């Protein structure tokens, strides 16, 4: 009898706890949002002797955001010798603006392209932010709020193309040589352009890793199991489109 009373008491306590716990979650408002910007291009070609290039930035959210932009080195670990103006600014809801990118210093090779990255980050407003106070005021809730906000940096390739490098990547993309090295497919790029591989197949097998191949360099892709036959590939063009299909035999 004593054991039965103890069990009953525990059951009642658990019921009260579960009810209170559920009630507490009813008063919690969950907000999970991903914040990003839409950029007006997927890549940019920069002529070293130019006065600069511009890039459109669009805020597709229905509230203002802060836009933070910079140019990074190829490995995205260091600041590149460029300035972006403005580097930090408010962009109102459903509005667009333009960034100006200008080379400041630094010597780039004159016989090949160099790769940098333009990275633009969207910083969303918080209730206490004075710069967005008029948009978020009056939006407090009686409920507790659990906010999960993820700011995403949008990065596009910035190709520094010297005057001595003529034409476009898709003009010479057919010169890439392919060979089987162990369980890898090695692509050799004998051109001064970055070859941004958009699609790659060995026979009927697709290689999903579409990493670029730097100028006068090579890159090894994972070879498909039982892959064999001709290699077919496409590259990304200067305007962000996809080139025609190139095809060649596989050197073993």
From Swiss-Prot:
InterPro entries: Ig-like_fold, PapD-like_sf, Periplasmic_pilus_chap, Pili_assmbl_chap_C_dom_sf, Pili_assmbl_chaperone_bac, Pili_assmbl_chaperone_C, Pili_assmbl_chaperone_CS, Pili_assmbl_chaperone_N. Keywords: Chaperone, Fimbrium biogenesis, Immunoglobulin domain, Periplasm, Plasmid, Signal. Its main location: periplasm. Residues 1-22 form the signal peptide. It comes from the Bacteria. It is found in: Periplasm. This is Chaperone protein AggD. The keyword Iron does not apply. It comes from Escherichia coli. The lineage of its organism: Bacteria, Pseudomonadati, Pseudomonadota, Gammaproteobacteria, Enterobacterales. Gene3D superfamilies: Immunoglobulins (2.60.40.10). The keyword Transmembrane does not apply. Belongs to the periplasmic pilus chaperone family. One of its GO terms (biological process) is cell wall organization. Pfam families: PapD_C, PapD_N. GO terms for cellular component: outer membrane-bounded periplasmic space.
